[in-house]
Amino acid sequence: MANTRSAKKRALVAAKRTARNKMVKSSLRTAIRKFREALGTENAPILLNRAFSALDRAASKGVIHKNTAARKKARLAKALAKATAAQAVAAANE
């Protein structure tokens, strides 16, 4: 347990920030999961934008590093492009 007043305050602040960061990360994971579940549907581009927004928000708040956000955004966009291309090929073969 913290002994000094400043150490007690730092412990409280750390607990608050941890709770806030957990909330942001949870909503980020939810947005990404919903996008991945919607791949191949007409809602995928809309959910991709929501995932991008969540990633940008988390990066701007310092919850995740900006390069991590950029990497995840690139991978999500690549997944959408791959799914869209697969749909186009399937439609052309029919």
Curated annotation (Swiss-Prot):
<dbReference type="Pfam" id="PF01649">
    <property type="entry name" value="Ribosomal_S20p"/>
</dbReference>
<comment type="similarity">
    <text>Belongs to the bacterial ribosomal protein bS20 family.</text>
</comment>
<keyword id="KW-0687">Ribonucleoprotein</keyword>
<protein>
    <recommendedName>
        <fullName>Small ribosomal subunit protein bS20</fullName>
    </recommendedName>
</protein>
<dbReference type="GO" id="GO:0005829">
    <property type="term" value="C:cytosol"/>
</dbReference>
<dbReference type="GO" id="GO:0070181">
    <property type="term" value="F:small ribosomal subunit rRNA binding"/>
</dbReference>
<keyword id="KW-0689">Ribosomal protein</keyword>
<keyword id="KW-0699">rRNA-binding</keyword>
<comment type="function">
    <text>Binds directly to 16S ribosomal RNA.</text>
</comment>
<dbReference type="GO" id="GO:0003735">
    <property type="term" value="F:structural constituent of ribosome"/>
</dbReference>
<dbReference type="InterPro" id="IPR002583">
    <property type="entry name" value="Ribosomal_bS20"/>
</dbReference>
<dbReference type="GO" id="GO:0015935">
    <property type="term" value="C:small ribosomal subunit"/>
</dbReference>
<dbReference type="GO" id="GO:0006412">
    <property type="term" value="P:translation"/>
</dbReference>
<dbReference type="InterPro" id="IPR036510">
    <property type="entry name" value="Ribosomal_bS20_sf"/>
</dbReference>
<keyword id="KW-0694">RNA-binding</keyword>
